[in-house]
């Protein structure tokens, strides 16, 4: 069945705020609501005109389990506008867009607010199983004697916290952390530490240049409860260089590994939202789209090499549209790790790998001047629920700023999946 394009009317994101060893100033819903208000205020329709609100979130707080509905209500969409939440790990925001696309294509919706949010700095700190069992025993103890006997069984090790974020970033099937899967890719494709650090420094340099040139005008500034303003991504480093990055020690494969904090994406809080519409809604509401989503693909692969997800997801789109890697004007590949992005590029160049895993000859060399032109998650950050929506939105913004036409946004997904979206701009169309 032919894919019916869906229009992107507008989009916005929050600044991406680096987690700094303490809960950040905003809950995940706060990030999305402030971003959404800025986005909806500039539209010609009322929030109540939306068909639905769909939000991707990987780590909602316990009091915001259906965070999509919470956000819809706090944005003033009214009781009648449904809101719901999706979760596909790192691609949760992209999944929200795809869910909106499917609702629009089937005729159930015609105007949808979709995207993602996460406040990873507020990821839960959990109790160990031993502590939970002890608390259950304490709660069931009757009388001073039982209480005292239970108290004697409490050990200091029971109080050791369990970091929820670390558990979430570890694959329960293969038992590897996301960083360890990146080490697998660096080893498989012979990626040197120097290459990873050089790529990472370039991500910061491109992000700095983008900030200086106003390339991130999709950002809506945030204000916290104290009145402090957050206007731009705060994890971009002016002093990043391959030489400084080379001093950092490996994190996931000590002491011989290649993956460090410096060549990995940052743990970040942030939100990104887009307004999607049908052709009929564009006409009836006299909307001015910024672009179209032309195709979507999801893929599954070995969780131990999950970082190759962009290759598995975007290649079928290229095949369907008879495109080569460099027939697209720009690419956004989410930078979970420098090793992961470079492994994707190496895989496309490897004829034996392509024939074994894709059933195709090598696709060739992607021109890196087309890739992540304003930096990526290594510099900007990776709020898991938001990143998939961010790369789609920024791809359209980057294309429009350069008067270009088509691009691909692709993302790897913990658990061994990949997602990709082919987009084009609408500038100059009547």
Regions found by a protein language model. Name each.
Residues 1-26, 153-168, 243-308, 312-315, ...:
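Condensing-enzyme catalytic core mediating Claisen C-C bond formation in acyl metabolism
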Residues 13-14, 25-34, 42, 158, ...:
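N-terminal extracellular/periplasmic Venus flytrap/periplasmic-binding protein-like
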Residues 24-143, 219-232, 304, 327-347:
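Conserved beta-ketoacyl condensing-enzyme motif
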Residues 26, 57-112, 122, 157-160, ...:
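Conserved catalytic cysteine-centered active-site region
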Residues 28-43, 67-71, 96-99, 178-185, ...:
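Short, well-ordered amphipathic alpha-helical segments that serve as non-catalytic structural scaffolds
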Residues 87-118, 126, 186-213, 273-280, ...:
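Active-site-proximal alpha-helical scaffold in enzymes
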Residues 111-184:
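Flexible glycine-/small-residue-enriched beta->alpha junction loops
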Residues 183, 215, 294-297, 301-379:
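Active-site pocket-lining segment
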